[in-house]
Structure formats: C-alpha cells, structure tokens
C-alpha cells in the first residue's frame, strides 16, 4: 500500500529536480506540508533547492551518482525526518524496487503499489493486462526479444514499420522505429543503449507501428478503495524523437465513440492491474480511427497541467490524498471546461534538428496575462548542463475554446524571452500558426512523425553573440554551506567571501550569477572539409568506425549522447577514416574534431 493505516504524510521529500520538483514543493506548501529537496552538485543553485523548506546534497554530477541512488535519497529522508517520498516523474518514479525500498524503510510512497509499477512498467506484462481488459491492441512480441535477429523475424512476419521499445520505461527513450529490415540491427542496439542509460535495464520488445498516428491518452485517478475516474483526455501528437513537445486537453477531434472507448478501456486496464494513484493510459489513434493501447505511465505526467487547467483538479494534491488512504471525492468523470495547451520549453536548437543545447540562461523572462501558467525549474542565471533532461520549463495556456487557447499561445510565446542558449520557442511560435495544427472544425493533420516528415523547418540555427558579463561587484555575496549534507545559506561581505582564490571556502560555494557563454557564429554543422566534427556538446556512446576504414556518404561514424538523447554523426563524403580521436565515453564539446575523411 502507498500508506500505512496509522500514518499520514507529515513531511515530503521530493526525489527529483527541475520544474517537477518545484511543482511538488508548491503543492506541499498548499497542503501545509513541509518539504525537503535533494540535489546533485550541478543543481546546488537550482530554484527547487531554494523553494523547499530544507535541502540535502546528494553529491555527484550525474543521475547515477545522485537522483538514481536509492541509498542517498533514503539517507536524506532519514536525516531530514521526512516520512513520505514523492518521486516526481522520470528518474525513480517508475522503479518498483525503489518504491518497495521506501515502504520497507517505513516511509509513505506517494505513488502506485510496487507491484502495479512492476506489472505496468514491464511493457510486455502491460500488454497482457490490456489484453485481459479487452483493450484494443496491435500485434507485438509476447516477451522481450533476445537479439536483433528476433526483431528481423517479427518484421518479416508482420511487416514494417515496427517499433522497438524499452520494456521498462517510457517518455520516448529507448524507442526506435525501423522502416526497413536493413536498419533493424543498428536501431535495436541504440534502443538497448538508451534504455540502459535511462532506466537501468535494456530489454526491449517489438510491435507493429501505426504509421502517422495520433497520440492520445487518458488521465486516470484511482484510490486505494477501488474507485477510478478518468479526468479527461490529452493529445500529445506533436513529438520529435518520440518525445512530446506540445500537449493539449481535452484531445480534440475525437468522436464520442472513440472518447468512450478510451475512457472505459483505461478504467478496465487500471482495475485489472489493481492500480491506485495518478496514472496515464496511452493510446495511438490511426488515420482510419483505429485505437491501439500503447502503455501505462505509472506516475504523474509532464503534461498533467493541461488536465488541471481544464478540470480544476490539483493532481499532486490528489496524489497526497490517495497516499493518505483517502477516498476519491470525485464519483464520475469530470466534464472539461475550456481548452488548454502546454508547450515544453526545451534547451534544444530547432534550427539544427532539435539538437540538445546546454548552456547558461543569461535571460529568462516568461510571459504573464490572462490564461497563462508557467511551471519552471530555471531562472535568469541558471546553468543548464548536459547531464540531465533538456526541459527548462513548461508554458501552459488556457482558453474558453481551442481557438482562444491558440490565440493566447501566440501572444504568450511572442512575449517569452530566453537568452544564452537555444530553446524550442521559435518552433512553438511557428507551429501555433501552422494550418496542420490549427485544423478546421473536424480534424487536424499533425501526427507523431509530422515534425520529422512534413513540417517545413525554416528556423535559423541559434547564434548567441552576447558579450560576457562584467565581474559581479555586489558588496555582499551569499555563501552556500553544507552541514552534514544539509544546505544552508550565509551572507558575507564580498571581500571576505572571495578571500579564497578559487572563489569558495572549504565549506561550500559562492552563489554567483553565471556569465553568459559567448558562442561562435557557426551553425554547428557536423562536417567541415575533411573533418567530421561534433554538432553539439555531449558524450561519445559508440564509435562505429575504425582507423583506416573506408566509409560512404551517410555511414555512421559515432553516436553522441546529451540530455538523455542519442544523436548519430554520419560521414559527409566517401573516403578513408583517419585521425580517429575519440572512443566510447569521451566527453566532447561542440565543434570537436572526431575524425577526418581523406
């Protein structure tokens, strides 16, 4: 169970970072609950750390060294006196072993039961549950595949395209679509690598892929007493690399029969899985109207605000109540009021095919006004590294109708100013005026691969030539110190605070406004003359060539990873590989020469 009969949530530790940590901390404050933040070293100055009532350092620079470390998080809970843990989304939110460890430590787990997470998190088991619940399904492998040969065999039997998908995770990570038999081997290996990095397990299964489908989902809320409601639908069809960029609620252009099938099958699936908590049942809707079950996300979704804005339901507060063992106050599915659209503000360069773009945020000026909400994990002065997800914030707009929401979105996006690094705001500004998204009274034409296959990308690559800031000359400096892992802030005279030549004292680090990084005027093309260069900052996860190897134009040279996304770098001409300068695990910066082709 998520809670013990004799206990209620008294103090919440949020085992996450960024905007979702801020969201949960604010909900805790609304519920008059003290909150505890945890943070990796790169996040020591993050907003969620300051907003919480207490903050504890996890140490480490990567997810594995911090937010994925069971022991460090449970230790922080013990030190802080927190009796409940909210996992947010991503990281450990869908890790059944962590949920069980929290419960075994005598703490309240704000989420579904470990068994439900295990059953629905395993996408193969989830398909079996969906089948028992008589949910609509496309053909797929009954169990995870052992190798690429099994994937090829499935494709030969059922045809392409096929989807190779991580069995233990979601969010588009560890998912690849093969449209030819020849590319299956490479895509299978890439899916396994991504799944291993993101979820700690690399098993994958395969299913038929519906071409040009819509992505529609149902927001479920279920208590521990068997009561289940669907708080509405969402459309999340605007994606790149199978990761969502724009979401809206309620899902537009569904027939009454389709909406009924989604609501009812979502409830049947959750009942079959003995599910409680907030969760999302996802579907694909084909061009012909065919509905197919996709997966269940056993957590709060990134896009939950659009449901909140159209129902008036605070989904995080609902999670708190369910974990306390309370019954749902809702007795039937709410009727949505108005229309809401969410835009993920990612640190990616839309002008360069959405390449990850780590860097400093020298200016962050979000919009305000009627119908505008912002969920953010950054601010002016934040530094966005390549270790974590690329999302900086979420802009949510609400209107009485879909047309009004789109109009407010255009205004809000025009007001949104972010400087210092590339973001997807230029894409959002373009797409809200695109006829494919606007549609007519009956339909629109966007689908899950619309961005890659149909959108006319005329966005210029990001170039930032801002000068560096002058040195900070404030008379006071705030020093961050850690005492037994607990974060404290002390204000000291600047000359005393800067007495240490390294800019910090042995106990902590000085809070300074990060200087905007001056970027060159090049567009980050992966090639120049003979050189094959890195189009972005990241880590080499695969080297596909050897010194002296002959390659053809388009052949894979290396695979880079940044912000949890893999990006292939290919040969720009025919020739022989010389001067191969990297290996798997090498950290590189944008423009690094990886090899030459002579």
Curated annotation (Swiss-Prot):
Modified residues (N6-biotinyllysine): 564
Positions that bind Mg(2+) 1: 282, 295
Protein name listed in UniProt: Biotin-dependent acyl-coenzyme A carboxylase alpha3 subunit
Naturally occurring in which organism (per UniProt): Mycobacterium leprae (strain TN)
PROSITE patterns listed in its UniProt record: ATP_GRASP, BC, BIOTIN, BIOTINYL_LIPOYL, CPSASE_1, CPSASE_2
Binding site for Mn(2+) 2: 295, 297
Domain Biotinyl-binding, first and last residues per copy: 522-598
InterPro entries the record matches: ATP-grasp (IPR011761), ATP_grasp_subdomain_1 (IPR013815), BC-like_N (IPR005481), Biotin_BS (IPR001882), Biotin_carboxylase_complex (IPR050856), Biotin_carboxylation_dom (IPR011764), Biotin_COase_C (IPR005482), Biotin_lipoyl (IPR000089)
């Amino acid at each position: 169970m998520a809670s013990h009969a004799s206990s209620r949530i008294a103090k919440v530790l949020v085992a996450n970072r960024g905007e979702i940590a801020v969201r949960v901390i604010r909900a805790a404050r609304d519920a008059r609950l003290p909150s505890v933040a945890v943070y990796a070293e790169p996040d020591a100055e993050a907003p969620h750390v300051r907003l919480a009532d207490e903050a504890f350092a996890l140490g480490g620079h990567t997810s594995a060294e911090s937010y994925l470390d069971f022991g460090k998080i449970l230790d922080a809970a013990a030190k802080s006196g927190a009796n409940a843990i909210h996992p947010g989304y991503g990281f450990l939110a869908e890790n059944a072993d962590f949920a069980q460890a929290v419960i075994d430590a005598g703490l309240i787990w704000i989420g579904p039961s470990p068994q439900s997470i295990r059953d629905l998190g395993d996408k193969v088991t989830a398909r079996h549950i969906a089948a028992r619940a008589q949910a609509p399904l496309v053909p797929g492998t009954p169990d995870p595949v052992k190798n690429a040969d099994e994937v090829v065999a499935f494709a030969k039997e059922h045809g392409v395209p096929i989807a190779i998908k991580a069995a233990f995770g979601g969010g588009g990570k560890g998912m690849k679509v093969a449209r030819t038999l020849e590319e299956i081997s490479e895509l299978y290996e890439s899916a396994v690598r991504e799944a291993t990095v993101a979820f700690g397990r690399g098993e994958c299964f395969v299913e038929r892929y519906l071409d040009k489908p819509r992505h529609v989902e149902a927001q479920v809320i279920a208590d521990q007493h068997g009561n289940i409601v669907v708080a509405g639908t969402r459309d999340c069809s605007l994606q790149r690399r199978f990761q969502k960029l724009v979401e809206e609620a309620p899902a537009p252009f569904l027939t009454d029969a389709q909406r009924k099938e989604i609501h009812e099958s979502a409830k049947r699936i959750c009942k079959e899985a003995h599910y409680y908590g907030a969760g999302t049942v996802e579907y694909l809707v084909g061009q012909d109207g065919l509905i197919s079950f996709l997966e269940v996300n056993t957590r709060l979704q990134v896009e939950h605000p659009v449901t909140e804005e159209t129902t008036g339901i605070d989904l995080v507060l609902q999670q708190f109540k369910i974990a306390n063992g309370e019954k749902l106050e809702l007795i039937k599915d709410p009727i949505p009021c108005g229309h809401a659209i969410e835009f993920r503000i990612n640190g990616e360069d839309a002008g360069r095919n959405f390449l990850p773009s780590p860097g400093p945020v020298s200016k962050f000026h979000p919009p305000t006004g009627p119908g505008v909400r912002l969920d953010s994990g950054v601010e002016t002065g934040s530094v966005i590294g390549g270790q974590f997800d690329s999302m900086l914030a979420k802009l949510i707009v609400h209107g009485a109708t879909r047309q009004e929401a789109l109009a407010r979105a255009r205004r809000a996006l025009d007001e949104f100013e972010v400087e210092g690094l590339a973001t997807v705001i230029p894409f959002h500004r373009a797409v809200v005026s695109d006829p494919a998204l606007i549609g007519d009274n009956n339909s629109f034409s966007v689908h899950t691969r619309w961005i890659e296959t149909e959108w006319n990308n005329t966005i210029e690559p990001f170039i930032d030539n801002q000068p560096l800031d002058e040195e900070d000359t404030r008379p006071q400096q705030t020093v961050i110190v850690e005492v037994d892992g607990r974060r404290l802030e002390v204000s000291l005279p600047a000359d005393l605070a800067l007495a240490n030549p390294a800019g910090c004292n042995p106990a902590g680090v000085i809070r300074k406004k990060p200087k905007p990084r001056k970027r060159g005027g090049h567009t980050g093309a992966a090639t120049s003359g003979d050189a094959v260069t890195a189009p972005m900052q990241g880590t080499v996860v695969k080297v596909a060539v050897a010194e002296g190897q002959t390659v053809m134009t388009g052949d894979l040279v290396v695979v880079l990873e940044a912000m949890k996304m893999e990006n292939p770098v290919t040969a720009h001409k025919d020739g022989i590989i010389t001067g191969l300068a990297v290996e798997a695990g090498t950290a590189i910066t944008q423009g690094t020469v990886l090899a030459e082709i002579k």
